[in-house]
């Protein structure tokens, strides 16, 4: 039996009662901290004795709703303080203490850490305290203009009265919606600096900046700016990084996805490198289709030499990505697309391999192989396929389906074509070997992409993250000449046929917020997102003109979702079940219908996209009409064809504003990197998603694990304060230890629970239950 010394102690019973009743836990009598020998260096350089009451006040503020944890936070921070400490370092120690306590069992520490981190940002940026008085928007805009961070021409369109009205709409309380990691990511990544080390913006300024930039040219713009600000700051949806970083800046490049294609000539290869570097500089993620590039050993007419093949050029593009990183915020990124029948396909597949020398590797790029039904059937039949040099087989590029087969077999009959026969399964195994060893090699199915496209054009690649499928084509230099002007200056004039660099602007709906909305609120949110994203096409700066040509002609948007797993969890649906498939089908049917409807409404207001009559939209055909029938057959949900037919007629009659509307970007789902925090309820996400479908009965009837139903609701601590709960999921796997005290009470603790114990050397420390030994004296539970 372990001895217990009791002073200033809250028993588990008292603590539970306090939490259940919603009362704050009084820690005013905690032992005074050992402050006598600690000196604090303040921000202005002055020194003063450490005052534990100040730290206590901060910790109690951060632990609002979780006051019972403040004692632990203070004590665990105290032991880290040394004789002389900078106030910034001391504050950081409090934050680190809270962060280190975050776990699945104790998620409330994330709220505490987020509040502490937020207070640190307030102090460092504008010396704001717990009262949270944001600096005026007018002052932020002025400082941004003075430091050439903001575009003064855009800001000049807003009157002083409008800026005052927008300032009044800023709600600092929404800063508390962030998780700890989300706050750190957002502040470091999206809140702009005015010097290398000084932040210009706080989080709500960032959201307002984006809203002002995207809605500046709207009629009734203040109302629309506020609506967009509300949607962003309430985390109903999120914009992609280029929008969050570049909106309202002088170099306002807002596209996330940049798709390029090159020609098999030196001008195109080098011009493509320049274009990739420029877009990477402005935070775009890039992709490049190299299918036309001739293979190693191909003859070069202009120099009477022989090509070194794609590999050296991939190293060239890799160097560009390293040099032109995304504004210093993240590394440059490029995905290379190539055809399965390319003569050098095995060399390209090996470019990320851990083996080999640096001379024949380009490990900093991503790679995607373009497959089709012909090749897959050869794999199934275990037959041979023939690889070709694209220089000798130019007509094979941009062919799919029966056209590909006919052209391919025609080249098989020609004698003057460089080729190589391999087993289809040998190539297939190489693809999966590289995938397993490097985690890369995307697979792009040309026929699936082109058969379901709305654009009636060949699409030869996707983007960096393989969710956007839109066409691109290279510019061609048709003339280059010297011209002497009237004043004697000499100029070089180059003329190109206009190619297309396909651009797409992304946003993602937060499905957890979506779940809370009425149908009317959902439609209102979708209208706001479509309008805001569509405006990016017009307000954006285009550093490469091929991008402007494509974007203004087709006005591509990519609206997707985030927090999909959380959405299913909150609906009590296991992710890998038929029920999840049915729910997902219904969700995206509804979302797609609303997004297309919003784009039609915008077309009525502002006009259809210029390339409308080239596409399937003009025929009244919708994406659901071209969807993969096998995929649609995976669910039993009946489609409401009446509503889709009516919508198709509206599209045919009035047009649509955007040639493409949806794309599921690879957003984080309730991970530590996610900027947006969501409430997953009182259950662990992992436990909920992995459990079997069982009857919701009590533990007594199920055994070691299952749902435990309370006789009456109790208040339990969650990441948003105390909430009422009627049941709990018990997985039966948490190891515990029982401890009996001198008063006869026996308590059962999980092994990762901490108790304050006096160690054999007489010092006190918080010790995990698992680490307790018989020679320790428990001081506090």
Protein language model features and the residues they cover:
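Extended catalytic cores of very large enzyme megasubunits
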Residues: 2-675, 707, 748, 778-781
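HINT superfamily self-processing domains
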Residues: 60, 669-781
């Amino acid at each position: 039996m372990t001895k217990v010394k009791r002073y200033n102690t809250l028993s588990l019973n008292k603590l539970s009662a306090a939490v259940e009743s919603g009362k704050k836990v009084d820690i005013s009598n905690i032992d005074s901290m050992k402050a006598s020998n600690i000196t604090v260096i303040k921000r202005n350089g002055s020194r003063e004795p450490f005052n534990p009451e100040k730290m206590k006040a901060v910790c109690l503020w951060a632990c609002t709703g979780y006051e019972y944890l403040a004692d632990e936070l203070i004590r665990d921070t105290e032991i880290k303080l040394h004789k002389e400490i900078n106030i910034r370092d001391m504050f950081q120690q409090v934050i680190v203490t809270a962060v280190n306590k975050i776990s699945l069992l104790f998620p409330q520490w994330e709220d505490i850490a987020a509040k502490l981190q937020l207070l640190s940002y307030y102090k460092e940026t504008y010396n704001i305290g717990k009262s949270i008085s944001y600096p005026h928007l007018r002052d932020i805009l002025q400082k941004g203009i003075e430091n050439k961070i903001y575009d003064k021409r855009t800001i000049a369109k807003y009157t002083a009265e409008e800026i005052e009205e927008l300032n009044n709409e800023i709600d600092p309380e929404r800063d508390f919606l962030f998780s700890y990691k989300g706050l750190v990511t957002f502040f470091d990544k999206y809140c702009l600096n005015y010097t290398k080390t000084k932040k210009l913006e706080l989080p709500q300024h960032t959201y307002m900046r984006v809203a002002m930039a995207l809605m500046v040219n709207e009629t009734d713009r203040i109302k629309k700016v506020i609506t967009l600000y509300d949607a962003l700051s309430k985390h109903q949806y999120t914009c992609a990084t280029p929008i969050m970083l570049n909106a309202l800046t002088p170099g306002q490049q807002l596209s996330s996805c940049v798709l390029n294609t090159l020609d098999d000539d030196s001008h195109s290869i080098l011009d493509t490198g320049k274009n990739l570097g420029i877009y990477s500089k402005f935070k775009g993620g890039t992709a490049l289709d190299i299918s036309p590039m001739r293979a190693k050993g191909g003859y070069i007419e202009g120099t009477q030499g022989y090509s070194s093949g794609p590999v050296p050029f991939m190293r060239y593009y890799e160097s560009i990505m390293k040099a032109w990183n995304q504004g210093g915020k993240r590394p440059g990124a490029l995905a290379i697309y190539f055809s399965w029948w390319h003569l050098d396909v095995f060399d390209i597949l090996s470019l990320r391999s851990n083996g080999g020398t640096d001379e024949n590797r380009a490990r900093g790029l991503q790679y995607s192989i373009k497959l089709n039904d012909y090749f897959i059937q050869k794999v199934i039949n275990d037959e041979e396929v023939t690889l070709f040099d694209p220089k000798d087989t130019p007509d094979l590029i941009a062919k799919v389906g029966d056209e590909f087969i006919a052209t391919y077999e025609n080249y098989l009959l020609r004698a003057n074509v460089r080729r190589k026969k391999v087993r289809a399964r040998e190539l297939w195994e190489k693809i999966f070997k590289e995938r397993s060893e490097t985690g890369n090699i995307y697979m792009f199915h040309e026929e699936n992409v082109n058969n379901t496209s709305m654009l009636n054009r060949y699409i030869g690649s996707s983007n960096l993250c393989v969710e956007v499928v839109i066409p691109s084509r290279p510019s061609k230099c048709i003339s280059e000449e010297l011209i002497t002007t009237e004043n004697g200056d000499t100029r070089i004039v180059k003329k190109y046929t206009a190619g297309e660099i396909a651009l797409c602007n992304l946003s993602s709906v937060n499905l957890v917020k979506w779940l809370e909305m009425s149908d009317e609120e959902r439609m209102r949110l979708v209208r706001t997102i479509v309008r805001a994203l569509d405006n990016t096409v017009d307000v954006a700066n285009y550093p490469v003109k091929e991008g402007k040509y494509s974007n203004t002609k087709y006005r591509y948007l990519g609206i997707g979702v985030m927090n999909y797993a959380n959405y299913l969890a909150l609906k009590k649906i296991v992710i890998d079940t038929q029920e999840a498939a049915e729910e997902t089908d219904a969700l995206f049917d509804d979302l797609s219908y609303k997004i297309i409807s919003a784009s039609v409404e915008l077309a009525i207001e502002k006009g259809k996209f210029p390339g409308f009559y080239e596409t399937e939209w003009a025929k009244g055909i919708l994406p659901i009409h071209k969807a993969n029938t096998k995929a649609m057959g995976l669910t039993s949900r009946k489609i409401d064809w009446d509503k889709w037919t009516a919508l198709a007629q509206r599209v045919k009659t009035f047009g649509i504003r955007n040639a493409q509307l949806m794309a599921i970007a690879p957003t984080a789902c309730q991970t530590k990197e996610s900027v947006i925090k969501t409430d997953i309820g009182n259950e662990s996400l992992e436990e909920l998603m992995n459990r079997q479908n069982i009857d919701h009965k009590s533990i007594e009837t199920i055994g070691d694990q299952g749902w435990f139903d309370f006789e009456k609701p109790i208040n339990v601590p969650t990441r948003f304060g105390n909430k009422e709960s009627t049941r709990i999921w018990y997985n039966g796997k948490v190891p515990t230890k029982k401890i009996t005290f001198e008063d006869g009470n026996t308590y059962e603790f999980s092994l990762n629970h901490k108790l304050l114990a006096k160690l054999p050397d007489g010092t006190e420390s918080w010790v995990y239950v698992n680490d307790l030994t018989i020679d320790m004296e428990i001081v506090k539970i």
